[in-house]
C-alpha cells in the first residue's frame, strides 16, 4: 500500500495551490495545510496525524541556543512518518524565547559598507501553531504530496549576488561600444 499511496499523492498536481512568500533573497513555496490535509483525507479516509507533545504536554521542544522545534506524525495505512520543523521568522531565522540580534552585510551604493544589525522577535504561540501546521504539510510531502516543492531545500543558501564594480561596469560599457561599432549600429551613451 505504501508505494500506491506515494504514487497517488506524488502525481497529484499541486501547482495551482502553491503559495509563494519572498523574504530577502529567498522565495519559499507553501501549500495550505487545510487544502493538503483535505486532499489526503479524500483519498485515504483512514489517514491520521498527531502533534507530538513533550514536557508539560507542550507541542514543542526548546533549546536556548537553537530555538523552538515542533514535530508531527502522519499515519496512512500501516506507514507512519515523523517530521520536524524549527519555528522561524519571516526571514527564516530561528525564533527563541527572547529577542536577539544578528549582523548582516550592509551594502551602500552597490558597495560593501560594513555590517548592519537585524533583530528576531521572540516566538509566540501563533508562530508555534503556524509552524506545526507547516510541519504537517512537510510531513504529508514524505507521503508524496507536493514533495517536489521541497527540492533544493537542503542545499546551502547562496550568497546574494555582489553588485558590479565601477571597473566591471566601465568594461561592459566599452565592450558594448566596440560591438556597436563592429555591427555598424549607432550607439548613444547614457550618462
Question: Can you annotate each of these PLM segments?
Answer:
Residues 187-191:
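Amphipathic, non-membrane alpha-helical rod segments
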Residues 1-174, 178, 185:
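Polyanion-binding surfaces on beta-sheet-dominated domains and ring/shell assemblies
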Amino acid at each position: 500500500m505504501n508505494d500506491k499511496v506515494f504514487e497517488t499523492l506524488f502525481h497529484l498536481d499541486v501547482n495551482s495551490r502553491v503559495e509563494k512568500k519572498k523574504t530577502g533573497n529567498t522565495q519559499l513555496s507553501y501549500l495550505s495545510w487545510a487544502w493538503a490535509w483535505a486532499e489526503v483525507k479524500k483519498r485515504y479516509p483512514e489517514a491520521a496525524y498527531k502533534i507530538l507533545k513533550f514536557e508539560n504536554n507542550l507541542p514543542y521542544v526548546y533549546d536556548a541556543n537553537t530555538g523552538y522545534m515542533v514535530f508531527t506524525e502522519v499515519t496512512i495505512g500501516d506507514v507512519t512518518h515523523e517530521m520536524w520543523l524549527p519555528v522561524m521568522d519571516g526571514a527564516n531565522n530561528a525564533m527563541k524565547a527572547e529577542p536577539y540580534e544578528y549582523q548582516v552585510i550592509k551594502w551602500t551604493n552597490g558597495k560593501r559598507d560594513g555590517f548592519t544589525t537585524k533583530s528576531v522577535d521572540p516566538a509566540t504561540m501563533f508562530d508555534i501553531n503556524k509552524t506545526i501546521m507547516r510541519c504537517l504539510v512537510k510531513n504529508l510531502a514524505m507521503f508524496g504530496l507536493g514533495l517536489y516543492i521541497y527540492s533544493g531545500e537542503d542545499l546551502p543558501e547562496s550568497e546574494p549576488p555582489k553588485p558590479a564594480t565601477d571597473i566591471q561596469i566601465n568594461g561592459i560599457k566599452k565592450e558594448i561600444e566596440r560591438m556597436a561599432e563592429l555591427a555598424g549600429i549607432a550607439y548613444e551613451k547614457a550618462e
